[in-house]
Amino acid sequence: MSLMDPLANALNHISNCERVGKKVVYIKPASKLIGRVLKVMQDNGYIGEFEFIEDGRAGIFKVELIGKINKCGAIKPRFPVKKFGYEKFEKRYLPARDFGILIVSTTQGVMSHEEAKKRGLGGRLLAYVY
């Protein structure tokens, strides 16, 4: 089995486990990008604690689910967005205004679209969570 997009696979796995009602999910393979996306989700209150477990290969993330995710997924292709262009993508990927977050990769790191707006940054869209 080969993974074409580990981030999309991880978010889909989280969404499926949340829908079934599991409390803990193990994500493998782990990567720095997945870790940063999980950190943004944790900072915004969508997941509980997560930890990296070394397994001798790429590693595994153990994520505690708290039942706050309705849907999450990767955005493909990774659209570039300017600092004033978030509203178009909010309408496309989020169900309502001020409900959910878009996760953006900027020059200053991975962050939510709200934080990127405050800092006046553009970037590439990675994922959505609500």
Swiss-Prot record:
Xref: Pfam families: Ribosomal_S8
GO CC entries: cytosolic small ribosomal subunit
SUPFAM superfamilies: Ribosomal protein S8
Biological processes per GO annotation: translation
Top-rank lineage group of the source organism: Archaea
Keywords, ordered alphabetically: Ribonucleoprotein, Ribosomal protein, RNA-binding, rRNA-binding
GO molecular function annotation: rRNA binding; structural constituent of ribosome
Signal peptide from the UniProt entry: none
Claim: RNA-binding is one of the keywords in the record: yes
Protein role: One of the primary rRNA binding proteins, it binds directly to 16S rRNA central domain where it helps coordinate assembly of the platform of the 30S subunit.
Description of how the protein assembles with itself and partners: Part of the 30S ribosomal subunit.
Similarity remark: Belongs to the universal ribosomal protein uS8 family.
Protein name, entry field: Small ribosomal subunit protein uS8
Gene source species: Methanocaldococcus jannaschii (strain ATCC 43067 / DSM 2661 / JAL-1 / JCM 10045 / NBRC 100440)
Lineage of the organism: Archaea, Methanobacteriati, Methanobacteriota, Methanomada group, Methanococci
Annotated gene: rps8
